[in-house]
């Protein structure tokens, strides 16, 4: 930020310097000041002209970005009208540094060298078609950031040519530029001429991001699945698919006063249990089921039956 303020002050001082020298030279040629300006000799006028040209050159160099942080302090030249008998100082004393002219000569050579380097940058042209609603400015939808710095009419062309440079030229020293020219035959076509590749941060490709596909849960429509299933019963007897219709019957008996024994009886007839269950013909005792395995009264019996079993006891 301080650098920008310093460059702005230096540029303003140079412009004021040149304007002041031009006014002094203009006043020396005015008829109303001919008597008081007779002391302005040819040497003084030449110095004033030199100051004007030097100030404009320095201002142009500053605008082109060829100044550095070590620019000399620029001081305004003394006013010859304020000191009639005194000749203005030499160019070295005017700029405040004996090596100022040498410094700007070196800067001018470096500027010429950088201009030659820019001409050696790669150059290519592309044609871009846009909608007519975009106007005369041309396409701006590329991936880079540009700043328009000029526009001029081209001889024999219907539309002007626009000039752009990278936004990060002064901060990252990126020399990429482009020219945009609308086609005379088809106004929707623009010829974009690029010069130089981007060396700034926006010219570095970003690492590719791997796309993670979300896991999708497939919901099965069981109603459609059930409707699409068919059962083929050809060649099968009806006896294989006969199922009991009545609900099962549970009977409970107390064994030796401890625990509960249950047996499941389906809807089949009593003949299915022949040889498996026999009743005790004693009239003084309750009927006890006799099964084909030996029952150990001392064995632990799991009584954790469902609640409806306990409620029915």
UniProtKB/Swiss-Prot annotation:
**Compartments reported by the entry:** Nucleus
Q: Which domain of life is it from?
A: Eukaryota
Q: Which UniProt keywords apply?
A: DNA-binding, Nucleus, Transcription, Transcription regulation
The principal location of this protein is nucleus
Give the GO cellular component terms, alphabetically.
nucleus
Indicate whether Ligase appears among the record's keywords.
Answer: no
Entry GO MF terms: DNA-binding transcription factor activity; sequence-specific DNA binding
One Pfam match: WRKY
DNA-binding region coordinates: 135-203
Q: Which InterPro entries match?
A: WRKY_dom (IPR003657), WRKY_dom_sf (IPR036576), WRKY_plant (IPR044810)
Family that this chain belongs to: Belongs to the WRKY group III family.
Q: What job does the chain carry out?
A: Transcription factor. Interacts specifically with the W box (5'-(T)TGAC[CT]-3'), a frequently occurring elicitor-responsive cis-acting element.
Protein name, UniProt field: Probable WRKY transcription factor 41
């Amino acid at each position: 930020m301080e650098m920008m303020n310093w460059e702005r002050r230096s540029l303003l001082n140079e412009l004021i310097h040149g304007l002041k020298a031009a006014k002094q030279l203009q006043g020396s040629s005015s008829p109303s000041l001919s008597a008081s300006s007779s002391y302005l000799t040819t040497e003084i006028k030449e110095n004033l002209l030199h100051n004007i040209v030097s100030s404009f050159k320095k201002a142009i160099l500053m605008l082109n970005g060829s100044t550095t942080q070590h620019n000399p302090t620029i001081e305004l030249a003394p006013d010859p009208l304020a000191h009639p008998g005194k000749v203005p100082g030499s160019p070295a004393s005017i700029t405040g540094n004996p090596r100022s002219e040498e410094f700007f000569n070196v800067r001018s050579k470096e500027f010429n060298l950088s201009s030659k380097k820019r001409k050696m940058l790669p150059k290519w042209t592309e044609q871009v078609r846009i909608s007519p609603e975009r106007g005369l400015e041309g396409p701006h939808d590329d991936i880079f950031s540009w700043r328009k710095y000029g526009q001029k009419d081209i001889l024999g062309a219907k539309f002007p040519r626009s000039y752009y440079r990278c936004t990060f030229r002064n901060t990252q020293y990126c020399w990429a530029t482009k020219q945009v020219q609308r086609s005379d035959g088809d106004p929707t076509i623009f010829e974009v001429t690029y010069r130089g590749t981007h060396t700034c941060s926006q010219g570095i490709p970003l690492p590719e991001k791997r796309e993670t596909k979300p896991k999708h849960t497939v919901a099965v429509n069981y109603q459609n699945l059930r409707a699409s299933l068919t059962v083929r019963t050809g060649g099968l007897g009806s006896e294989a698919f006969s199922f009991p219709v009545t609900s099962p019957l549970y009977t409970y008996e107390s064994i030796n006063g401890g625990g509960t024994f249950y047996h499941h009886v389906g809807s089949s007839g009593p003949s299915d249990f022949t040889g498996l269950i026999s009743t005790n013909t004693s009239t003084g005792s309750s009927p006890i089921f006799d099964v084909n395995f030996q029952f150990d009264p001392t064995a632990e019996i799991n009584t954790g039956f469902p609640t409806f079993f306990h409620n029915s006891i």
